Amino acid sequence: MKNIKKNQVMNLGPNSKLLKEYKSQLIELNIEQFEAGIGLILGDAYIRSRDEGKTYCMQFEWKNKAYMDHVCLLYDQWVLSPPHKKERVNHLGNLVITWGAQTFKHQAFNKLANLFIVNNKKTIPNNLVENYLTPMSLAYWFMDDGGKWDYNKNSTNKSIVLNTQSFTFEEVEYLVKGLRNKFQLNCYVKINKNKPIIYIDSMSYLIFYNLIKPYLIPQMMYKLPNTISSETFLK
């Protein structure tokens, strides 16, 4: 079979023979794409099927363009269109700009979908962290939907939060238990507007930071507590 390059199919229609041949030569996600995908789906990324579960695609939408570009590069062979700009006015009357992108549908994404999707709904299996979450997954989960607990610029609080409001209390307890057992993180469930979030205590900050540091990109440094400077990060 001839080796078809991505740039040969980027502007072709979905029924193009060449595009179908390009997709057929792709077999599975590489290990980085799989591990990062777990973290992204724990965050705000969607994994969806348009053909009743035969194939899946991943969909992304974020405010941070640099992060979007980074993720699209990570999934480069699966993303055929550049990120597109979205504008909307929120309930306060302010303009909100985000960037959207998606992969094409493919059976390679079924492995991720099988971990999360039950009856077309994103769910958390009780063994997800212990069996599948890696430091790379944790880093993308944090970059996607985590941050420091205290955004006061003078704060010395090193606590971290992972936003899990879209999951049930039971599912978040699964995640907390897994983070404690696998990574020895001192964390627990907090309630934010009647929804569960994961709070990682300051005493576990260095453990957490050392786990995710190899995978963080500089543009997401602002999410870290003030005790870690960009100079330290770039060393």
UniProtKB/Swiss-Prot annotation:
Its cofactor is Mg(2+). GO terms for molecular function: endonuclease activity. Mitochondrial DNA endonuclease involved in intron homing. It introduces a specific double-strand break in the DNA of the 21S rRNA gene and thus mediates the insertion of an intron, containing its own coding sequence (group I intron), into an intronless gene. Specifically recognizes and cleaves the sequence 5'-TAGGGATAACAGGGTAAT-3'. This is Intron-encoded endonuclease I-SceI. It comes from the Eukaryota. Optimum pH is 9-10. One of its GO terms (biological process) is RNA splicing. It holds the Pfam family LAGLIDADG_2. It is found in: Mitochondrion. It is an enzyme of class 3 (hydrolase). Belongs to the LAGLIDADG endonuclease family. One of its GO terms (cellular component) is mitochondrion. Its EC number is 3.1.-.-. Keywords: Endonuclease, Hydrolase, Intron homing, Mitochondrion, mRNA processing, mRNA splicing, Nuclease.
